[in-house]
Regions:
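Acidic/His- and Gly-rich active-site-bordering loop/insert found
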Residues: 2-100, 105, 109-125
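General structural feature for long, well-ordered alpha-helical segments within catalytic domains
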Residues: 11-18, 31, 35-42, 70, ...
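Divalent metal-coordination and catalytic microenvironments
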Residues: 22, 60, 74, 104, ...
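Histidine/acidic-residue-rich, glycine-tolerant segments that coordinate divalent metal ions
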Residues: 81-83, 87-99, 105-106, 111, ...
Length: 393
């Protein structure tokens, strides 16, 4: 383990340079063309065969020459966010309005580092390490196409990493059970009847209905859901009306729900649909709701978490299982429905570098790049531990 960690440490400068290259050229979900091509060039350098799934997903296949068999899948997401970077750094985003503000440039870099190290250890394992460079995590459209293409078929384990600005740099959070919420997206369209604002009785005010509904939705959380179960309903957009002096004929609400169980997911959908219909009907209007399933609740396998902890310990990386539940979603959860696995969090917060302690999805977000070799080492070592059980002993 010490030798593998040292191999990754020696890649430090290369990994930092690669991460900065990705950071300068962010691309949004399903449009990661430059990113995918750059990943392919790195895999070519390592002698790792690869294929495209869809337009921008890249899958590398590394087959060992040693004893043993099996398949372990390692995943990194590659897409960026529609956020303007405000950091004044040499590697800041060169694309206006886009930024790697969630660490996906780091995830991609760590997995490429692991690929390079593992390619030099082909004789040390049998079976296959499969590298999933997944697009479109931020819009919930990346994992399911890879599953549909059979990329998880036959896998013994699936493992992924995400940067964490709430954990000290150089540590890893790996928590059994629930970690990230399931995420649904909804649009509610309300239909009323237009009238002059001076004669509201002749119309049906879709804006008023929408306003009542926004408030009523919070009662689903406070009065129709167990207070010990974390759920969230958030409405981020409300559009209505066409004139200041007319009763609004239509209104549109757009929002999201977050939850940690299938039962809560079904309950939220059912009660939101009912609230929209009943409140609209009370005032003479109608409503319909559309739903998009962005991500399943992310639940780590306890046994796999133990495996990851043992590998991290052998690498000299401190671990914690005390990371708080997150109401943000991640479609890595879809892989965990297919096979046993775990999603770990790589601490990247360094108080000496204040921007590394800032939450993601902000224009001033950054990471401590000294953690990149650790992420690469954990990816590589975990894969070896699965394919060669003697490796971690």
């Amino acid at each position: 383990m010490n030798a593998l960690r040292e191999e990754c440490r020696q890649l430090r400068d290369e990994l930092i340079a690669l991460r900065r290259e990705f950071h300068r050229a962010p691309e949004l979900g399903l449009h990661e063309y430059h990113t995918a091509a750059r990943i392919e060039r790195e895999l070519d350098r390592c002698g790792i065969p690869h294929e495209r799934v869809g337009e921008t997903a890249v899958v590398g296949h590394l087959t060992g020459n040693g004893n043993g068999s099996g398949l372990v899948v390692l995943r990194a997401d590659i897409d960026a966010l529609p956020i303007q970077e405000t950091n004044d750094v040499p590697y800041r985003s060169q694309t206006p309005g886009m930024m790697h503000a969630c660490g996906h440039d780091a995830h991609t870099t760590c997995l490429l580092g692991a690929a390079k190290v593992l390619s030099a250890h082909r004789a040390d394992f049998g079976g296959e390490v499969r590298f999933l460079f997944q697009p479109a995590e931020e819009i919930g459209q990346g994992a399911r196409p890879l599953i549909a293409a059979g990329m998880l078929d036959g896998a013994q384990r699936v493992f992924g990493l995400h940067t964490a600005s709430d954990l000290p740099a150089g540590t890893v959070g790996v928590k059994p059970g629930a970690n990230n919420a399931g995420v649904d997206h909804f649009i509610i369209r309300i239909h009323g009847k237009s009238a002059h604002v001076s004669t509201p009785q002749l119309g049906v005010d879709a804006l008023y209905i929408a306003s009542e509904l926004v408030v009523a939705l919070q009662s689903i959380v406070t009065r129709m859901t167990s207070p010990v179960e974390p759920v969230l309903i958030g409405v981020g957009k409300l559009n209505a009306g066409t004139a200041y002096n007319a009763v609004a004929e239509t209104a549109m609400l757009e929002g999201t729900t977050r939850m940690f169980s299938p039962e809560s997911r079904a309950h939220l959908r059912e009660t939101i649909n009912a609230a929209a219909a009943h409140i609209s009907a009370l005032y003479g209007g109608t409503a319909e709701a559309e739903w998009d399933d962005f991500a399943t609740p992310l639940t780590n396998d306890a046994g796999v978490c133990g495996e990851v902890e043992r590998v991290a310990d052998a690498l000299g990386i401190p671990t914690t299982a005390n990371r708080a539940l997150s109401l943000s979603g991640d479609d890595f959860a879809e892989y965990l429905l297919q096979t046993k696995g775990a999603y770990a969090y790589l601490g990247t917060a360094n108080p000496k570098k204040p921007h590394t302690c800032i939450s993601n999805h902000r224009g001033d977000f950054d990471i401590d790049e000294e953690t990149l070799p650790l992420g690469a080492a954990l990816y590589a070592a975990y894969a070896l531990s699965v394919l060669d059980p003697q490796f971690a002993k």
